[in-house]
Swiss-Prot record:
Belongs to the BCKDHA family. Transmembrane segments: none annotated. The branched-chain alpha-keto dehydrogenase complex catalyzes the overall conversion of alpha-keto acids to acyl-CoA and CO(2). It contains multiple copies of three enzymatic components: branched-chain alpha-keto acid decarboxylase (E1), lipoamide acyltransferase (E2) and lipoamide dehydrogenase (E3). This is 2-oxoisovalerate dehydrogenase subunit alpha. One of its GO terms (molecular function) is 3-methyl-2-oxobutanoate dehydrogenase (2-methylpropanoyl-transferring) activity. It catalyses: N(6)-[(R)-lipoyl]-L-lysyl-[protein] + 3-methyl-2-oxobutanoate + H(+) = N(6)-[(R)-S(8)-2-methylpropanoyldihydrolipoyl]-L-lysyl-[protein] + CO2. Its EC number is 1.2.4.4. One of its GO terms (biological process) is branched-chain amino acid catabolic process. SUPFAM superfamilies: Thiamin diphosphate-binding fold (THDP-binding). Its cofactor is thiamine diphosphate. InterPro entries: Alpha-ketoacid_DH_E1_comp (IPR050771), DH_E1 (IPR001017), Oxoisoval_DH_suAlpha_N_dom (IPR022593), THDP-binding (IPR029061). Heterodimer of an alpha and a beta chain.
Length: 410
């Protein structure tokens, strides 16, 4: 007889399912203000404790506490609030438009607004972002025209991308927003390469890339970490741990019993684990990582702990795999509500101002939608010309493509 039990595999399970309340104790939260802030020139190995703790600034009463408090000005706080509100309202309006069959597809960032907006405010003009489909807040924070965003969603005759990208896969070189890819984890290797190119040219611009918790299981994630470490690429690598990769719990990607931030430390990269629903913590950690990159101190990996409050996309029904009230029970709360409480406590915001701003931004989004629809909708056939498929690739069109264009008569 064998002295050993039969071998068996471990399959991680979520701590909550429909009809069974989620136990969020697996998150291992740190009290606000208690996590140390190292100097920007810290050795990566000395950030190992920061990869397991949780950087937080806002306490339960809305006070900013601890060494990570970025001491933002009133103007910065107001800009951040407006950017988060506009992002959420834009999402809500586009979700409604999809349900009305005005759009074919949409993806929200509900509950994750602070990650894109605060991070963007901590960057500089010229820094290049390599986003996923939940970082529309970058464009909104950088005041990219809402009309152009909606025209892209509609793929109409005014679509800046001429109908060549799926809805929500925006792109704008001028806004420092690299083309979104539907393939997972491509953002990391692209950003590392861009950052290396910036260094080779002797530039001062840095790169910042985003992926989700599920995409850390892709090989590109590990390849990017290797190159970033070896060449000390000026890049920020953001892992948005929103607990779910479509219907797959984050533990399946390797988050059980450890953190995604810890993978950076193992690769020789300075790493942080941060409350992604704390606007001030997001700004502070982003500013710290950006300073490291800009001072040639190497890359940083940041795990943003948050919660995907909405469905994965308009094709998803999360009620099939998680409790309906999960977001309301998530211990890190709503990023907008938390910043609002802080600003009211400072005396620079009020419920009345919040409501008035909400209405004004809602009207702005609606006006942008109407203007975008004037350039064409899904049903009226006003789309980019067929001739546009021959543009924007070759400086001089090859003979075989000239023949094809002639045959099409465009």
């Amino acid at each position: 007889m064998s002295d050993y039990e039969p071998l068996r595999l471990h399959v991680p399970e979520p701590t909550g399912r429909p009809g069974c309340k989620t136990d969020f104790s697996y998150l291992h939260l740190s009290p606000a203000g208690e996590v140390r802030k190292p100097p920007v020139d810290v050795e990566p190995a000395e950030t190992s404790d920061l990869a397991y703790s949780l950087v937080r600034v806002l306490d339960d009463d809305g006070h900013a506490v601890g060494p990570w408090n970025p001491q933002l000005s009133n103007e910065q706080l107001l800009r951040g609030m407006r950017a988060m509100l506009k992002t959420r309202l834009f999402d809500a309006r586009m979700l409604t438009a999809q349900r009305q069959k005005k759009l074919s597809f949409y993806m929200q960032c509900l509950g994750e607004e602070a990650i894109a907006t605060a991070h963007t405010l901590a960057l500089r003009d010229g820094d290049m972002c390599f986003p996923t489909y939940r970082q529309q807040g970058i464009l909104i924070t950088r005041e990219y025209p809402l009309v152009d965003m909606i025209c892209q969603l509609l793929s109409n005759e005014a679509d800046p991308l001429k109908g060549r990208q799926l809805p929500i896969m925006y792109s704008s070189k001028e806004a420092g927003f690299f083309s979104i890819s539907g393939n997972l984890a491509t953002q990391f290797i692209q950003a590392v390469g861009w950052g290396m190119a910036s260094a080779i040219k002797g530039d001062t611009r840095i790169a910042s890339a985003w992926i989700g918790d599920g995409a850390t299981a892709e090989s590109d994630f590990h390849t990017a970490l290797t190159f970033a470490h070896v060449y000390r690429a000026p890049v920020i690598l953001n892992v948005v741990n929103n607990q779910w990769a479509i219907s797959t719990f984050q533990a399946i990607a390797g988050g059980e019993g450890t953190t995604f931030a810890n993978r950076g430390v193992g690769c020789g990269i300075a790493s942080l684990r941060v409350d992604g629903n704390d606007f001030l913590a997001v700004y502070a950690a982003s500013e710290w990582a950006a300073e490291r990159a800009r001072r040639n101190l190497g890359p940083s990996l940041i795990e943003w702990v948050t919660y995907r409050a909405g469905p994965h996309s308009t094709s998803d029904d999360p009620s099939k795999y998680r409790p309906a009230d999960d977001w309301t029970n998530f211990p890190l709360g709503d990023p907008i509500a938390r910043l609002k409480r802080h600003m009211i406590g400072l005396g620079i915001w009020s419920e009345e101002q919040h409501e008035a701003t909400h209405k004004a931004l809602e009207a702005e989004v609606l006006a942008a939608q109407k203007q975008a629809e004037s350039h064409g909708t899904l049903i009226d056939g006003r789309v980019p010309s067929a001739a546009s498929m021959f543009e924007d690739v070759y400086a001089e069109l090859p003979e075989h493509l000239r023949r094809q264009r002639q045959e099409l008569g465009v």
